[in-house]
Amino acid sequence: MTTINTLVFDLGGVLIDWNPEYLYSKLIPDEKERKWFLTTICTPDWNEQQDEGRSLKEATEHLVGKYPDHERSIRAYYDRWTEMLGGPIHETVEIFRELKFGPAGKGSGGPGAARLKLYALTNWSAETFPVALEMYEFLHWFDGRLVSGEEKTRKPFPEIYRLLIERFGIEPAKGIYVDDNIRNVLPARELGFIGIHFRTPQLFREELVGLGVL
């Protein structure tokens, strides 16, 4: 069996709880109206354009011009962006801690610390990611990070996975990639990674135990 020496984490939905509902349930209490707003105006596809490098200002002004009656709610998307963060997904952060430092905590070593390189591959705006770096200490534990907004490309486009491989010298056949979006797992599998579709921290832990890395 090939020895696994690399694990690549997605961030949102795996290590960090992020959901626009946390903010917009306060701004738009009516569920039907809120769902319409988040699927018609500030949509996931629109947000991903910022993940791919478009400026927050340009994106916001474009929507305000198109939907002036919803200006307040549109501007809130990035003005109050931190209110979409639900905090760390603590059980997954604990798995990360064990892989990085060993089960007893920082400085203890352990199998993960001895042989696993740990990286992050995230769809995230280059303008908001520095805020997350200040908020979450564990984002500094990685051996390397690749942020889509800084690279002007994003998952699931194959080029961002190839960039990850080239930049950090990763051998995909010896690597694991974990993401809560199966759309983003499939390209990693095609390039040779063991792709894990993240559902819960407990299932993730069980899969890592089965692969012999925990």
Regions found by a protein language model. Give the residues of each.
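Substrate-recognition/cap helix-loop segment adjacent to the acidic, metal-dependent catalytic center
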Residues: 28-31, 92-102, 114-150
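Generic structural signal for small/hydrophobic residues in well-ordered secondary structure
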Residues: 10-13, 53, 120, 145, ...
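Surface-exposed amphipathic alpha-helices with a cationic face
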Residues: 96-103, 112, 165, 185, ...
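N-terminal helical cap/lid subdomain that shapes the substrate entry/recognition surface
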Residues: 2-94, 125-128
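Asp-based, Mg2+/Mn2+-dependent phosphohydrolase catalytic module
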Residues: 1-4, 125-126, 130-214
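Hydrophobic residues in well-ordered beta-strands that form the structural core
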Residues: 17, 120-122, 197
